[in-house]
Amino acid sequence: MEKFRNAFIEFYELSKKYLENSTGQKVYEVNYDNDIDSFLTVFPILESKIGGDINCAMSDETVILAMQQVEFKMFTFWYMRSAANVKSMLNKITDKETKEQFIRIFKDMLVYAKVITSINNMYSNMKKDTNEIVQDLKKILGIVSLIKSANNEHQAYKILMENNSFIIRTINKVLADSNYIIKIIALFNTDVVSDKIKLEEYKDVFSFSKENVIFGIKCFCDITIDGIDQINNKYVSFFKKVLPNIILFQTSCVKTTQFVNIFSKLSSIVYSEILTNERLHVLFSEIMASFKTKVSVEDLKKRKVNNIQGLISEISNNREMYKNIFVEEYEKHKTTLISIVQCITDNYNINYKENAVDIEFIFDFIQEHYISKL
């Protein structure tokens, strides 16, 4: 909102000069809050009229088209005076540099208004969306439970196929929602649902675009794993059938077979290491022992933390405590954890674009750009 306000102040200062010079009339006293609200109110109509997507890459022609739709009389400083639109003022500017500056200012206003409108819409739908995520998560955990209780791969494959439509629909929904990560965070941090400023901060950090996802998929496909044979089982067969139905895979020009092969190898490595890696077992035991000194298991039982909704509620109600525990344990065991993961990466000859993977760099990047923002 602050960026939008600053852009509007620039717009007002430049407009004031040209309106007064061209009409000989003094502008009224400006009320920035009212004018900003007025602009945001008409923005959805304005967006529909210009027919183009409002973003940083839009052309000057699109910005000028938007100027034609905005009349000065809607603002307090020129309220109900002449019906001059913003483009008419642009036409009065003879200096090329000033004209380009005015177009840039109005473009910034449009882009920031788009962001604010998006945040307001997300804010309005947040509770409904988070409830839907919980229901999806319960369904996924139910499917996982059925697979774990299956006697063999054929039974597990049958369970997956029976839930094929739900899995495809859920993956498409997650990848199509640029704010999905924020909604996951909102499950554990209720401030996001009630605080638009916090929501705007999180949107800057955790939102993702379709282009981001496609780029991530392509980067993932640049991973090579030479230390393990190709995995061939019913689970791999299932996901080779599913991914061609995922919209972003259809538009990313990535071979789904290649993606599944890499993912199946990584999944197999993770599963195997969790079962057999002694250093991991020691690390997990130390973390759990430390956790039990900070959180009473009996108290958790009394608070009925026995399902996903109970866990979400527990973390949400005691967010600062759990955040502090996480930070403390991570700092205490960070060096050991990085060493373990780096050894696993090296043992399986996992490379990215034919170069060795630097696990410490990845951990530091995630901590600096994402975890520290929570």
UniProtKB/Swiss-Prot annotation:
It holds the Pfam family Pox_A6. GO terms for cellular component: virion component. It is found in: Virion. This is Protein A6 homolog. The lineage of its organism: Viruses, Varidnaviria, Bamfordvirae, Nucleocytoviricota, Pokkesviricetes. InterPro entries: Poxvirus_A6. Plays an essential role in immature virion (IV) to mature virion (MV) transition. Belongs to the chordopoxvirinae A6 family. The keyword Cytoplasm does not apply. Keywords: Virion. It comes from the Viruses. Its main location: virion. Transmembrane segments: none annotated.
